[in-house]
Amino acid sequence: MKKLLFLLAVIAFATCTTPEYKTLPMDEFEKAIAQPNVIVVDVRTPEEYAEGHIAGAINIDWKAGHFAEQAEVLLDKDKTIAVYCIHARRSKFAAEELMKMGYKNVIELQDGLEEWINAGKPIESAVEEVVYHQ
């Protein structure tokens, strides 16, 4: 009887865990983000983002302390959310947080943007427009 209760407890615990996000190698990530209904999120600081990011990515800074609040406003839970950072450290935390928040389809770039750049994949830089008022 104890074995049966233990087995039931293990099964119950296993079914209550948070679903996991997928970490994709660079080529698979590139194919995935080319699909419609995918939102690409750069979780680095705005300064890092401005230096260069994957085309079409929006910036939600993981370190800023309001990631969840910004994600709720900017991201659609019915779409695939593709996250990345420079070395795939912050993006892991961001992906886990998104899953906890109820996002069902979250993917993360394995090895981060540095490997993307080293492989010669395209990035774009944010160029600030300076307007002078007289």
Describe each PLM feature range.
Residues 40-42:
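Structural scaffold elements adjacent to functional motifs in cytosolic proteins
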Residues 11, 45-48:
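Intrinsically disordered, low-complexity boundary segments flanking structured domains
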Residues 84-85:
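Short, surface-exposed ligand- or partner-binding patches at beta-edge/loop junctions that are enriched
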Residues 1-13:
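Sec-dependent bacterial lipoprotein signal peptides
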Residues 4, 16-38, 47-80, 90-134:
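Rhodanese-like catalytic fold shared by cysteine-dependent sulfurtransferases
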